[in-house]
């Protein structure tokens, strides 16, 4: 068996022969990472990516200076979608090791689930995986209901049914109740709503191949909020939280929805479809209606919703939208505490009115007259949140997935956002 490469930390610069910008050096004893006190976690993550690029698949983190955050930064960069990597972790106290183990279990579940091929992960499989994860951490406190196919239409989940009816794999709504109180009448503290589009072709507003090839990841919001709830439970979440995953394929067929169709929602809103590739908001609307009916103190929806958010922030930040300044500030505080990247983008009352339709109350997409696509998408969703000005956060999760590797991430899912939402739930 190959001996593990030893990885140590140092606050001293590398030998001058490595250059004055060297972040790591190699000697007979292994690899040394040279911390500079400026962005040590980022330095460790980037170095881990380089170590993986050298083909080193077994490492041992040794010596002083390793803690949970530094171990996790190393793993975030070291993990990739292909092959097996083995890490021998340093000695940590029980609390730190438990935290690390929970991250390895749950956030890796999120990354692996998002990376799974669409052929293997349809709407029903995604819902069942979410149930399995949450039952693995708190089965005695979890109940759930899965509604699919024609049952959705009969129960007036018209957005989800309309988007998903074009696929042979029926659309699915997972409604999961985490209630650790034992009181079936306990108030619901929070609702999490996730977009679970397991493959997005764009429908009849079809995507080009260059924009479709990563669309197995269009369920990243659903996977992330599922992981966030599971992770919050491992951190001691003792409040009742409900999870709604809106899962579907968006495909082309003789039964697929078309431009000009009008969707009539349970809350009385009518929406004209003018872009079948703006389907995420159509399925989320059903989840938000259900979430609002619980009258929680907090609603968080998460979705890979718009290219506009990605244009603004790249894959480096999740975009945050809210009318509730206090709540937005709390989430940004949680993000800072967890070293995760979130950035707030504008959401104003006028964005709610920038989706005009000649035939319905709302259009499902903006026009060239109103080009702030990420903000108008958030404005659209607000029509399905009963008290949208308080207690609601919308996250357009641009940092969920990377099509190609970069200096700190392998190609594929990142798992970013799990810790921040869990932090907010347990604060």
From Swiss-Prot:
Co-factor(s): Mn(2+)
Record has Ligase as a keyword: no
Cofactor note: Binds 2 manganese ions per subunit.
Annotated compartments: Cytoplasm
Binding-site list for Mn(2+) 2: 195, 200, 218, 279
Pfam family, one: Peptidase_M17
GO BP terms in the entry: proteolysis
Entry's EC annotation: 3.4.11.23
Database matches in SUPFAM superfamilies: Zn-dependent exopeptidases (SSF53187)
Assembly notes: Homohexamer.
Cited function: Probably plays an important role in intracellular peptide degradation.
Record protein name field: Peptidase B
Source species: Salmonella typhi
């Amino acid at each position: 068996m190959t001996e593990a490469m030893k990885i140590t930390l140092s606050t001293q610069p590398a030998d001058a022969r490595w250059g004055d910008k060297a972040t790591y050096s190699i000697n007979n004893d292994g690899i040394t990472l040279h911390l500079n006190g400026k962005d040590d976690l980022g330095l460790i993550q980037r170095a881990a990516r380089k170590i993986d690029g050298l083909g080193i698949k077994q490492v041992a983190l040794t010596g002083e200076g390793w803690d949970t955050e530094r171990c996790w930064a190393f793993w975030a960069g070291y993990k990739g979608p292909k092959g097996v990597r083995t890490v021998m972790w340093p000695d940590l106290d029980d609390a730190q090791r438990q935290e690390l183990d929970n991250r390895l279990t749950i956030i890796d579940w999120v990354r692996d689930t998002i990376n799974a091929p669409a052929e293997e992960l349809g709407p029903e499989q995604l819902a069942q995986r979410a149930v399995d994860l949450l039952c693995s951490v708190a089965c005695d406190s979890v109940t759930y209901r899965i509604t699919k196919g024609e049952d959705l239409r009969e129960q007036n989940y018209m957005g989800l049914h309309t988007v998903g009816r074009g696929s042979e794999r029926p659309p699915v709504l997972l409604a999961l109740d985490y209630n650790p109180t034992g009181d079936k009448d306990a108030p619901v503290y929070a609702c999490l709503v996730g977009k679970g589009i397991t493959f997005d072709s764009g429908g009849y507003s079809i995507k080009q191949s260059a924009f479709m090839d990563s669309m197995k990841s269009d369920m990243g919001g659903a996977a992330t909020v599922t992981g966030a709830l599971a992770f919050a439970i491992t951190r001691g979440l003792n409040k009742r939280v409900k999870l709604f995953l809106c899962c579907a394929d968006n495909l082309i067929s003789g039964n697929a929805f078309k431009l000009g169709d009008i969707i009539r929602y349970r809350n009385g809103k009518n929406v004209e479809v003018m872009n079948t590739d703006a389907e995420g908001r159509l399925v989320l609307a059903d989840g938000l209606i259900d979430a609002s009916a619980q009258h929680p103190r907090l609603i968080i929806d998460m979705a890979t919703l718009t290219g506009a958010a990605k244009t603004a922030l790249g894959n480096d930040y999740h975009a945050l939208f809210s009318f509730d300044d206090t709540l937005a500030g709390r989430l940004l505080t949680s993000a800072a505490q967890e070293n995760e990247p979130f950035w707030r983008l504008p959401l104003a009352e006028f964005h709610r009115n920038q989706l005009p339709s000649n035939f319905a109350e709302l259009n499902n997409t903006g026009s060239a007259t109103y080009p702030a696509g990420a903000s108008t998408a958030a404005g659209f969703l607000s029509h399905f949140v009963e008290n949208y000005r308080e207690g609601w956060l919308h996250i357009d999760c641009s940092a969920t997935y990377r099509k190609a590797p970069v200096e700190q991430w392998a190609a594929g899912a990142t798992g970013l956002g799990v810790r921040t939402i869990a932090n907010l739930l347990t604060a």
